[in-house]
């Protein structure tokens, strides 16, 4: 593996490999925030295009692709099978490897739960300190597990306060901020996002038929962008269409003509893992480049699907089960045609109270 440079998802400007907690420096200066992504030299094999090609740190990855007998035309990628119970372990494994290799002593993140738990676990495994800036409504099980893992937890009422702490820590030479400090947000650290490419590679290897659609819960598009990049880099495959699911129109509003850097009012209800009032350029690009869509699934609808799935023994959190509601609608409206196979990404289990 040879990581060549970082490139902006918006303006395509190139930068040497370094840490940019505000995203693309050029776009940041111009007041139009956008994230960066990793680019490798042409001699690197597609499935080695990762910043750190190492054995799994805690056993993350290789999660099952489930065929449910009652779910016609789709499989479920069960990311709840990761060590701390969510897809965020893939991000944490990669970004903590980077922090350790770069000589940082602490990693810091603004998180609604899953990312903080993942980062705390992988930081502990690497002997690094971890600071998590969370909301005051963070469920007690998450608080307890963060304490068990040795994380420093700080709770705030607003995004601005959470980002303020991460911004302060990012100014310290011993700390790597892995969630961005720009407003509006651009997404998380690009080296961590590379870990999500493995989801695409695993799906391609596990699926018995061509996957034409992938349905993904989303907040700021880290997962969706990583999955898109993973499929796009695989030779001989047509990247599937990505359908990003949100609790109220954010990306959907952008696709209808609203500016990507806007503030979008709405109520996330109990969908804390995909909450937030902004979207990102990387989320928009993932949809546009794949020919996908944005799907709105309310908290009430997620509650209905949560109950249905629990009744069948499935233990995914509410934000995860939004993909089932979105898939049902995509099939009904013909966006996913008869005979086209889809993968629904179930991102986390329900045991954390999220």
Model regions and ranges:
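Phosphate-binding loop/pocket of nucleotide- and phosphate-handling active sites
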Residues: 261-268, 322-354
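Positively charged, low-complexity intrinsically disordered leader regions
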Residues: 43-105
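N-terminal juxtadomain amphipathic helix
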Residues: 1-65
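Alpha-helix C-terminal capping segments
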Residues: 97-103, 117-129, 229-234, 325-335
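A short, small-residue-rich loop immediately preceding and capping a beta-strand
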Residues: 95, 103-122, 126-135, 211-223, ...
């Amino acid at each position: 593996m040879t990581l060549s440079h970082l490139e902006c998802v918006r303006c395509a400007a190139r930068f040497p490999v370094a840490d940019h907690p505000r995203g693309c420096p050029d776009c940041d200066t111009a007041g139009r925030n956008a994230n960066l992504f990793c680019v490798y030299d042409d001699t690197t094999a597609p499935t080695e295009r990762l910043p750190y090609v190492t054995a799994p740190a805690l056993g993350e990855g290789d999660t099952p692709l489930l065929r449910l007998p009652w779910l016609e035309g789709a499989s479920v990628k069960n990311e709840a099978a990761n060590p701390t119970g969510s897809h965020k372990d893939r991000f944490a494994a990669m970004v903590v490897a980077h922090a350790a290799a770069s000589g940082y002593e602490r990693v810091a993140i603004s998180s609604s739960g899953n990312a903080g738990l993942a980062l705390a676990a992988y930081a502990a495994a690497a002997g690094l300190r971890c600071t998590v800036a969370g909301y005051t409504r963070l469920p007690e099980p998450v608080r307890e597990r963060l304490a068990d893992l040795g994380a420093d937890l700080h709770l705030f009422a607003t995004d601005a306060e959470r980002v303020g702490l991460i911004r302060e820590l990012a100014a310290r030479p011993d700390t790597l901020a892995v969630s961005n400090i720009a407003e509006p947000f651009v997404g998380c650290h690009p080296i961590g996002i590379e870990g999500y490419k493995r989801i695409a590679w695993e799906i391609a290897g596990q699926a018995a038929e061509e996957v034409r659609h992938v349905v993904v819960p989303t907040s700021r598009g880290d997962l969706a962008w990583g999955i898109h990049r993973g499929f796009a880099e695989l030779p001989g495959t047509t990247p599937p269409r990505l359908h990003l699911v949100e609790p109220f129109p954010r990306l959907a509003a952008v696709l209808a003509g609203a500016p990507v850097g806007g503030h979008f009012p709405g109520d996330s209800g109990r969908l804390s893992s995909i909450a937030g009032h902004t979207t990102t350029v990387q989320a928009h690009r993932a949809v546009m480049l794949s020919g996908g869509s944005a799907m709105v699934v309310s908290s009430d609808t997620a509650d209905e699907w949560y109950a249905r799935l629990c009744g069948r023994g499935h233990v995914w959190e509410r934000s995860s089960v939004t993909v089932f509601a979105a898939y049902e609608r995509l099939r009904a409206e013909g966006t996913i045609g008869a005979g086209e196979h889809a993968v629904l990404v179930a991102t986390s289990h329900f045991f954390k109270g999220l």
